[in-house]
């Protein structure tokens, strides 16, 4: 289950270039730095676009607890991102790949679930991703956050892969609406195999589409690093909205009604600027607003 090699070159102020170096692909793509401000919470994130086949999918990766902060850099060092990015390049999949960074005083739960939803909404709307497939991944705290997103937003995601996470506080009825593949290690001293296995049993009792791999001898760290194999990613990306029976990629209880573009000095803009700093606002049908500080 070794990871396919991928090199990472750090480019200050521009992004992160992922380049497959095993000779199988020439596809390169850059993770550019952006931020979102929603409900008074500022969250940095990275976004990359892969130019591949088919309609673009939205891919989200949630990092573990040791990568929290506001440098928009530390979260990119997790091995799972390399594995997923490499897979997208090798398979020539068309995707928008998001990697948010959780603030140091937060976790992937509570108000951060709403911030993540606003991030998804922003890219679904601004990049015309209506009816797109949305996939979510995460390890450790990010695995727990992935479970929590499935619980908070049923039918939003096409498929999910929470790794070494804790689903104990999640609503099984909601989570059961999404195909899920989870991986746990028997030597994990942080997350409980029994908790994950019991929750999978609850999902199966509700007719959910699930896979659970329990790896003998894997520690928490090893599980977070080695779980994203080609075979498992094939299973995740093999699901689409038609095959999964998912009706609507956006939760119907809070839909984006309009989008506004504003300069940093508060002037309303008629369209998104081609370059420079500006603020993008999503106006929801319940009156709430999510703001994004954008740099092009």
Annotated model-derived regions:
Residues 155-167:
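A conserved short beta-strand
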Residues 58, 62-117:
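Active-site machinery of serine-nucleophile hydrolases
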Residues 51, 105-140:
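Gly/Ser-rich "nucleophile elbow"/oxyanion-hole loop immediately N-terminal to the catalytic nucleophile
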């Amino acid at each position: 289950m070794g990871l396919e090699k991928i090199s990472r070159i750090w480019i200050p102020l521009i992004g992160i270039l992922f380049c497959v170096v095993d000779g199988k692909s020439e596809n390169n793509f850059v993770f550019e730095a952006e931020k979102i401000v929603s409900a008074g919470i500022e969250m940095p994130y990275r976004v990359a676009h892969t130019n591949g086949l088919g309609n673009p999918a939205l891919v989200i990766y949630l990092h573990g607890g040791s990568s929290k902060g506001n440098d928009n850099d530390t979260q990119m060092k997790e091995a799972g991102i390399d594995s997923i990015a490499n897979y997208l390049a090798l398979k020539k999949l068309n995707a928008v790949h998001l990697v948010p960074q959780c603030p140091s005083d937060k976790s992937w739960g509570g108000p951060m679930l709403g911030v993540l939803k606003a991030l998804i909404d922003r890219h679904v709307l601004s990049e015309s991703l209506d009816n797109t497939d949305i996939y979510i991944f995460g390890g450790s705290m990010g695995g727990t956050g992935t479970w929590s997103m499935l619980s908070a937003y049923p039918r939003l995601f096409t498929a999910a892969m929470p790794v070494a996470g804790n689903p104990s506080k999640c609503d099984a009825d909601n989570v059961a609406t999404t195909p899920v593949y989870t991986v746990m290690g028997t030597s994990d001293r942080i997350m409980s195999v029994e908790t994950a296995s019991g929750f999978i049993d609850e999902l199966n009792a509700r007719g959910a589409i699930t896979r659970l791999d329990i790896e003998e001898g894997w520690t928490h760290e090893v599980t977070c690093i080695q779980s994203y194999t080609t075979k498992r990613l094939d299973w995740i990306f093999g699901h689409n909205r038609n095959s999964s029976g998912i009706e609507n990629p956006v939760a119907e209880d809070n839909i984006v009604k309009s989008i506004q573009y504003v300069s940093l000095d508060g002037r309303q803009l008629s369209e998104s600027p081609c370059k420079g700093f500006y603020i993008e606002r999503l106006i929801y049908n319940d009156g709430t607003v999510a703001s994004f500080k954008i740099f092009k």
